[in-house]
């Protein structure tokens, strides 16, 4: 008999046979001790041999060209750095920038590398799609069972009609054909819906088959017509009439109250529409009346040229044209004048007060040369407006600076007279009046931004983000004096008072800042704690600094110390030209048509026009343009297209003056032919003048 042996936990061996019997048990008992002894002997031998193998040394098998290293080389550590950069990612992607009209390299490259991606086709059993599949599967099973049952019944009917000779065999067949009683279905094991694994396999793709059919093409027709403004208008009006007739047919009869309310609403709507139409028509009629009233002035603006300039070689005149004023702004000084960069006949005027002991309201007015009698837009403000600037890319956006230290942005296209953005004490407004604001290029996120300078010693960059203004301090105008002792032993660094600034036309990061101490600081947007250079320019407050439109190194400044100075920011030995005008100079401006022509206004009511190419010492035009003696001129600006200037005074009036031919003379050669006119020619003309006044470099003696 076969013997079955098992080993217990204690190490003993038990035996047993498949068929029980005393003889069999005896045989097993006799065999057990012998087998156990043999196993013990085998274990002892295995233990001895295993110990010997453990004690024996094993020789390493290595190839002949194996590199042998000493202990120092083996202990040397190598640093392995794992990075998330994709080695196959391209490093030299170049894209075309439509904004800058040039190709630019893309610095940020996507480092994502996908090694394997598989979209699973498993769905949750409780989802809607799973329920729909179960319903479809159950319906198909029911249909198949019904078909099987119908086939069985038909077979039974046929067997009943036929006479069978062997009923027993028929009974057997019926018994065989009848299905067995369905057993109770066991509970189906449900899978864990949160623990599953996806499997994939390669299957044979079904070949594509092309099928085609012939159909009749849709009918086509050629038609042509002309489309212009009045035909489009007529078509819209016909469609509107059809819609109104359809509404009248569908409208049910209403009560008297509803009729009254509808009549009131329609009356209000028609009244508002009529007012808008009347206002537009009234504006056109007003311009027509002004054109007839000021026809002589319009003719002078367009065609008049002073013929007496032919007899005066180095002298010119200013022809007064229109005078702009508004009844509610007569007692407010003109604090800023700015031409619209898109609409050449439109300009903005800011009104405020330079008497800071009696601060009152302010006002922003928009005038046009087509209607000098009344402003186009009026924006009253609670605080005096000290400066204004219009964005070149969006001529409907105007940034302003107030006397209370806040800044704001107006949208001319909006019907609301309030600013769309305005800074508050929570958003970092200035603590002193804002003297100048200027739009700059969009930041890296394409957000609009502008800069402002104030008497609190801060130059701030304002960014328009969604519905709020965010500020960033660009630089603080710290003085060279030692820190002063503050309360509780603190040290206070005195700050200068900024009065004006101007950004370079070509170098985006470079700008100048003028102060009340008479200094001009050359600053950079990249350095917020250090000046690039400082010019000891004037003895009193600097009222204006402005870069030349053509020469990248030249800028001009004016001050309350009666002087106007022209500087080269790379020349440290002093100004290139200095002019004493005999009165406080309120504003100065370069001409947009020449690099050597500039104009300045003084507190005695005079306009001074200089052309360095004709006379380097005296103005070629000095003319009083105010009617009252005590009227002070505050600002002046050139029109970029027409030969006129705008001059504002402290009584709220803005005067337009036309330059005579001698004030905008084109340089000619010895034969009388006009020289090349362009940026390079203007730069060369200015360099020729600067070469005469620059000190020659000193030779270093070795």
From Swiss-Prot:
PROSITE patterns: WD_REPEATS_2 (PS50082), WD_REPEATS_REGION (PS50294). Its main location: cytoplasm. Consists of at least two heavy chains (alpha and beta), three intermediate chains and several light chains. GO terms for cellular component: microtubule; outer dynein arm. Microtubule-binding protein that may be involved in dynein outer arm assembly on the axoneme. Residues 1-11 have a biased composition (Low complexity). This is Dynein intermediate chain 2, ciliary. Belongs to the dynein intermediate chain family. One of its GO terms (biological process) is outer dynein arm assembly. The lineage of its organism: Eukaryota, Metazoa, Echinodermata, Eleutherozoa, Echinozoa. WD repeats lie at residues 380-420, 429-472, 490-533, 537-577, 580-620, 628-667. Residues 189-206 have a biased composition (Polar residues). Keywords: Cell projection, Cilium, Cytoplasm, Cytoskeleton, Dynein, Microtubule, Motor protein, Repeat, WD repeat.
